[in-house]
UniProtKB/Swiss-Prot annotation:
Its EC number is 4.2.1.149. It comes from Salmonella paratyphi A (strain AKU_12601). The keyword Lyase applies. Pathway: Amine and polyamine metabolism; carnitine metabolism. Catalyzes the reversible dehydration of L-carnitinyl-CoA to crotonobetainyl-CoA. GO terms for molecular function: hydro-lyase activity; L-carnitine CoA-transferase activity. This is Carnitinyl-CoA dehydratase.
Length: 261
């Protein structure tokens, strides 16, 4: 594993810290290491939730390493499994990822956060997609994911002028889940992770699968699709041991013991 990436396992929760002073910028080598970490997380049955954060208090990630670019790394270089930053092109991840944004999330750093399922950010965090000012475009998900979250006028301003969005504005638009003090950031992310661990893993996998499959469908069509039998996790969860355990635990006034089957 890259020395720029620190992995910590806390039971079923994996913490990934990007630590590349001064700005946690990501070159191809680092992106490959991040992809390996996220794919291992995906495939490890003991892990339930991942938290991705940046080292230090100023930068979550400044995105693509422009020093590497100046030395010849192309914008369309091979950034490894999972695409840029290891997560932006993993489309079959059935476990939740939390981005704990500790500072500036610019360019590919913002795109990395957008690829997560939840964003918890510090009060000093801000978000921007400045690629157009560098002669490129935010094609690691920014130009695709942001329009699903914001009105066109706001998206256009952000992607065409590179203007920054504060943590509080991001909260108002619903891009982030929580804004907390810098000192509370990781505790808040871990609290959310534990809440996710308390939910049944098969149910979460089914939810993510349904979101992916039906997000562009009308509601009626979505109903038909999820009941068509083509999905993997949704039919499984309906007939799982966990589907019996949940109501049983509720009736017995105890915490459920999920088996993931």
């Amino acid at each position: 594993m890259s020395e720029s990436l620190h992995l910590t396992r806390n039971g079923p929760i994996l913490e990934i810290t990007l630590d590349r002073p001064k700005a946690n910028a990501i070159d191809a080598k680092t992106s490959f290491a991040m992809g390996e970490a996220f794919l291992n997380f995906r495939d490890d049955p003991e892990l339930r939730v991942a938290i991705i954060t940046g080292g230090g208090e100023k930068f979550f990630s400044a995105g693509w390493d422009l020093k590497a670019a100046a030395e010849g790394e192309a914008p369309d270089a091979d950034f490894g499994p999972g695409g840029f930053a290891g997560l932006t092109e993993i489309f079959d991840l059935d476990k939740p990822v939390i981005a704990a944004v500790n500072g500036y999330a610019f360019g590919g750093g913002f795109e990395l956060a957008l690829a997560a399922d939840f964003i918890v950010c510090a009060e000093n965090a801000s978000f921007a997609l400045p690629e157009a000012k560098l002669g490129i475009v935010p094609d690691s998900g920014g130009v695709l994911r942001l329009p699903k979250l914001l009105p066109p006028a706001i998206v256009n301003e952000m992607v065409m002028t590179g203007r920054r969005m504060s943590a509080e504005e991001a909260l108002r638009w619903g891009i982030v889940n929580r804004v907390v003090s810098q000192s509370e950031l990781m505790d808040s992310a871990r609290e959310l992770a534990q809440q996710l661990v308390n939910s049944a893993p098969l149910a979460i996998a089914a939810l993510k699968e349904i979101y992916r499959a039906t997000s562009e469908m009308p509601v009626e069509e979505g109903y038909r699709y999820i009941r068509s039998g083509v999905l993997k996790h949704y039919p499984s969860v309906l007939h799982s041991e966990d589907a019996l355990e949940g109501p049983q635990a509720f009736a017995e006034k105890r915490d459920p013991v999920w088996k993931g089957r």
